[in-house]
Amino acid sequence: MSSEEEDQTAIVCDNGSGLVKAGFAGDDAPRAVFPSIVGRPRHQGVMVGMGQKDSYVGDEAQSKRGILTLKYPIEHGIITNWDDMEKIWHHTFYNELRIAPEEHPTLLTEAPLNPKANREKMTQIMFETFNVPAMYVAIQAVLSLYASGRTTGIVLDSGDGISHNVPIYEGYALPHAIARMDLAGRDLTEYLTKILTERGYSFVTTAEKEIVRDIKEKLCYVALDFEQEMATAASSTSLEKSYELPDGQVITIGNERFRCPETLFQPSFIGMESAGIHETTYNSIMKCDIDIRKDLYANNVLSGGTTMYPGIADRMQKEITALAPSTMKIKIIAPPERKYSVWIGGSILSSLSTFNQMWITKAEYDEAGPSIVHRKCF
């Protein structure tokens, strides 16, 4: 990179299925965190001159959700609606970070095992629509491991749209052992919506689903022993908590608080045949070389918003200990900032001096086209 490019701080943008985390390389937390939502008015505008827009992004869409239909352009970690995604990136650069993308190298993130076309299109939009000088696409789980200060370990990264186990040895992800589950925060929100219906509380619109997400984030936790917790909930009201809805109505929830995230350990709750997160972690370790398993067991790193439930680390410890050889030392690392650890890892990576030759530059892109991304980012 030439000297005038170097004073341009890199931008780190972690596009999650649920939240966009964006900011500047070298910072210790993202400047902008907003929902990956694009909202469009449900009804025709009647007030002339209100300056109604045809679409709203992020927090603005969230605050006007009552009159909008909300759509998430990223589903299960894969971008399904590129026009909306472009709106989100535009909003990120110009409204949230207030920078000109053509002046800053940009680091984007993606889920492991994503379709190749996905990262090519990302590369193309960055260079052709936003004219960035340089860009890079990094695997989310690898960044989380960097953020925890390790180069070897197995990451369980669970966000809103997707969860995956990624074993990493000396900084390299081991692709044959990666496990990907399409079970994550959004599915848990759906499930909580369903079990709240059994209590007679109904949440129907896209806007009301957001209320359920808030209930989930504030009140849910993972039980150490599910059966025992169910018994406690049945025999006393000690586990009940109340939540005030935006209209002032107060609802009470009891065993739903831990039944919802229990789905991570028992996906059959929502009719999925997949193994629970403890089994996928174990299976992923078992697919790795026998010599490195010990290091993986001792470095189980949790990352992403869906690992934020109280009690999840203790439960993982218990479940993996039950599966692993009895003498094995097992350690679950749950950093308090794990909601943003992918972003933090990106901030660390892109501010390393050695990373300068890793960027895909505009010149390289012009010469080789979008497929350059597979050669330079792995």
From Swiss-Prot:
Enzyme nomenclature, EC number: 3.6.4.-
Protein name according to UniProt: Actin, larval muscle-type
Task of the protein: Actins are highly conserved proteins that are involved in various types of cell motility and are ubiquitously expressed in all eukaryotic cells. Multiple isoforms are involved in various cellular functions such as cytoskeleton structure, cell mobility, chromosome movement and muscle contraction.
Key words, A-Z: ATP-binding, Cytoplasm, Cytoskeleton, Hydrolase, Nucleotide-binding
Family of the protein in this entry: Belongs to the actin family.
Pfam families, sorted: Actin
Domain of life of the source: Eukaryota
A GO cellular-component term linked to this record: cytoplasm
Chief localisation class: cytoplasm
UniProt organism field: Molgula oculata
Catalytic activity: ATP + H2O = ADP + phosphate + H(+)
Compartments it resides in: Cytoplasm, Cytoskeleton
Molecular function GO terms recorded: ATP binding; hydrolase activity
Gene3D superfamilies assigned: 3.30.420.40, Actin, Chain A, domain 4 (3.90.640.10)
